[in-house]
Amino acid sequence: MDDAVAAGTREVIENHDFMSWLGMELVEFEEGRAVLSIPHDEKLTNIVEGSRGTIHGGVTATLVDTASGFALRTTFDDPLEPALTTTDLDVTYLRPARSDLRAVAEVVRAGGSMGYTDVKVYGTAPDGEQKAVVKGSASYRLFRDRAGRSETDGDR
């Protein structure tokens, strides 16, 4: 991906209220792959006794979904104007997340109308080693013939 596309993608994240509230950042953006991060923040953690201080599972699920979408954006002619939507999201929690998160999403297949990704979300274990805290996959409907158009634009 060229620098202008990566910069435009970073701007999408910065201007998206939810993504920016999470502190999400684009780390890497290349053909078939996107790496996103979210810093550990108390506002994102569970408050239930026994889980206190661990990042809420919805945050990691969001990271799986968003990283998948950005990885699939790289398969469009214009990654800044894609039309796509999640059709299936699978998230498996491997261990509690208690640190900054880093999601690595890779495109498994991107056809004319469907795209599939595999994702791993990493956190830092108490011993300092990076370990997978979540593994996930996603399926997306790709609207290649309608890139840049909203669902309300109707069929043309």
Positions of predicted regions on the chain:
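Catalytic strand-loop segment that frames the active site of acyl-thioester-processing enzymes
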Residues: 23-54
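Compact, glycine-rich, soluble single-domain proteins
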Residues: 50-65, 69
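N-terminal leader/capping segments at the start of a protein or of a new domain
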Residues: 1-28
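Beta-strand residues in well-ordered beta-sheet regions across diverse protein folds
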Residues: 37-39, 104, 118
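Hydrophobic beta-strand-centered segment that forms part of the acyl-chain substrate-binding groove
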Residues: 69-104
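HotDog/MaoC-like acyl-thioester-processing domains
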Residues: 96-99, 108-156
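A generic structural signal for short beta-strands and their flanking turns/coil linkers
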Residues: 20, 32-34, 85-89, 99-101, ...
